[in-house]
Regions:
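Short, high-confidence coil segments that cap the C-terminus of an alpha-helix
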Residues: 88-90
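Conserved acetyl-CoA-binding loop-helix of GNAT-fold acetyltransferases
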Residues: 62, 68-81, 110
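Conserved acetyl-CoA-binding loop of GNAT-fold acetyltransferases
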Residues: 108-119
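Short coil/turn motifs at secondary-structure junctions
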Residues: 46-48, 65, 98
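Short beta-strand-to-coil "C-cap" segments at the C-terminal boundary of structured domains/repeats
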Residues: 44, 125-129
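Acetyl-CoA-dependent GNAT
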Residues: 1-58, 82, 118-119
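Residue-level recognition of the GNAT/N-acetyltransferase active site
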Residues: 58, 63, 96-98
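Conserved beta-strand-loop-alpha-helix junction that forms the acyl-donor binding cleft
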Residues: 92-105, 121-123
């Protein structure tokens, strides 16, 4: 098998939420190569309390050598599917605008996120799962 990518999903159940880690792996020669982790996205799916039915996404990362190939979008699609499977109705994300360029907001908007709130220096965006 030639070069490719695949994802693995790990779910840890807690009392009030499920923590999810989705890892992205890359291989050059599937039969003779040890895959390397080149991306990750993490999310928490809340089962009870104020945020019940919401999934919060954080820590989306793709290694620089593997960017511009649609892999971050692939990880986010996997995160949305997993959140929906675990009962989330909404997926949210937030970050500091001081630490991220504005194009990040535009990218998430293209993924279907709407800007729900802006705090001083912070952004919160949501989309249905």
């Amino acid at each position: 098998m030639t070069e490719g990518y695949y994802t693995e999903t790990y779910i840890t159940e807690w009392k009030d939420k499920d923590n999810v880690i989705i890892s992205l792996w890359h291989w050059v020669d599937f039969d003779n190569d040890t895959p390397e982790q080149v991306g990750v996205v993490e999310l928490a799916v809340y089962k009870h309390g104020e945020h019940e039915g919401e999934a919060l996404v954080w820590n989306l990362y793709v290694d620089e050598d593997h960017r511009r190939k649609g892999l971050a979008r692939q990880l986010m699609n996997e995160a949305h599917k997993t959140a929906k499977h675990l009962g989330a109705k909404v997926t949210a994300l937030e970050w500091s605008l001081k630490e991220s360029p504005y194009w990040v907001i535009e990218w998430y908007t293209r993924l279907g996120y709407d800007e729900k709130e802006f705090g001083p220096g912070n952004a919160l965006m949501k989309r249905p799962t």
